[in-house]
Amino acid sequence: MFKAKTEIIERLAGKYPKRIEELEKIFDGKTNIYIDFANVRPWSNKLGWHVDPKRLKQFLDSFDNIGKVNFYYGTLEKDRVSEQFAKEIRGYKYELVTKPVKIMSLSIDVSSIPSDSPDIIKNFVRGPLLKKFKVETIEYLNNELLELNKQGIKYIEDMKCNFDVEIGRDMLIDYERNSVETFVLWSGDSDFADPVAQLLKDKKKVILFATARRVAKELNGLQKDGLVIFDIQKIRDFVCWKKELKN
């Protein structure tokens, strides 16, 4: 049953009643939500608007059969903005699942390799694509890296913090121990294909909230087995930043 948690949600529900009806059918039985925020946040580049965690939680809380809403987010240690964001997520009453972001140093030092060597570039370009490069392309890229080296830049930092193991584990635990009937995953990552396939095989309802062209083919292929993909464009005004509301 739907009961708006805020006046804005109530107004929007009156404006888009069919969206609410559709979601009431989706959130069928005991429902848990799993939000892979590192996957969700970049969607704004394509969507042209942002998912607001506070408004999203208020919207989800308006459906009384939604139980746990897990929010997976990597925290940058000793980073004030990152730690404050995690604090806010807890304040919104999400079940926050977090761990430190790993920061990896990747060498871009080409000063001791031949100009036509792919030894450094191969760490950033996948093999099948690298094989398509002409020697001139490799030489050009190495020359660009050498210019950075001359400026004293010998490595770059890359951040990594995946939650595919934790999310897959939590979904299966909720199935085995907590009698969850409907599993709603906010992600389009191929890493979730196996746990989703298992849940579908066990006759559970799985809904993928994502956006067009951000769903891996492995997940798209599970639609024939019952996976439902819901385009979050349909609920833009319910979950976007307030300043991005259409009206």
Residues of each region from the PLM?
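Nuclease catalytic cores that cleave nucleic-acid phosphodiester bonds
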Residues: 98, 103-247
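Domain-level signal for Mg2+-assisted phosphodiester chemistry and nucleotide/NA-binding surfaces
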Residues: 2-140, 152, 156, 200-214
